[in-house]
From Swiss-Prot:
One GO MF term attached to the UniProt entry: formate C-acetyltransferase activity
Top-level taxonomic group: Viruses
Pfam families xref list: Gly_radical
InterPro entries: Auton_GlycylRad_Cofactor (IPR050244), Form_AcTrfase_GR_CS (IPR019777), Gly_radical (IPR001150), Glycyl_radical_cofactor_GrcA (IPR011140)
Naturally occurring in which organism (per UniProt): Enterobacteria phage T4
This protein's name: Autonomous glycyl radical cofactor
Gene3D superfamilies associated with the record: 3.20.70.20
Positions of post-translational Glycine radical modification: G95
Limits of the Glycine radical domain: 1-120
Record key words, sorted: Organic radical
Protein's job: Acts as a radical domain for damaged PFL and possibly other radical proteins.
Length: 120
């Protein structure tokens, strides 16, 4: 299975998994998340492949939580140094959307440390 992010056009920013038969929408402004579409919709669009690592299935008692922030490490580091350049930078923290600049410096460092990992 492969993952892709669309980089241009109407579906810009859409992230989906594809197995050759169908595409599963992960994040999108134009498709319902967790829906399945014909992957041919995306053929010919400028996209980048996203590396994914399949993990063995582990039974977890209780809930799970994942915040997805599609950002570059350098962007957040620059936002710490030059907050005036990023007045609208919004990130997900504990299920809530928050302006990065409204966080304390300690909270910003914590977000950066937890957002960028070598693997899941």
């Amino acid at each position: 299975m492969k993952a892709y992010q669309i980089l241009e056009g109407t579906h810009k920013g859409t992230i989906y998994f594809e197995d050759g038969i169908q595409a599963r929408i992960i994040v999108s402004k134009t498709f319902k998340e967790d829906s399945f579409v014909d992957p041919e919709i995306f053929y010919g669009l400028h996209a980048r492949e996203i590396e994914i690592e399949p993990q063995p299935t582990v039974k977890i008692e209780g809930g799970q939580h994942l915040n997805v922030n599609v950002l570059r490490h350098e962007t957040l580091e620059d936002a710490v140094k030059h907050p005036e350049k990023y007045p609208q930078l919004t990130i997900r923290v504990s299920g809530y959307a928050v302006r990065f600049n409204s966080l304390t410096p300690e909270q910003q460092r914590d977000v950066i440390a937890r957002t960028f990992t070598e693997s899941l």
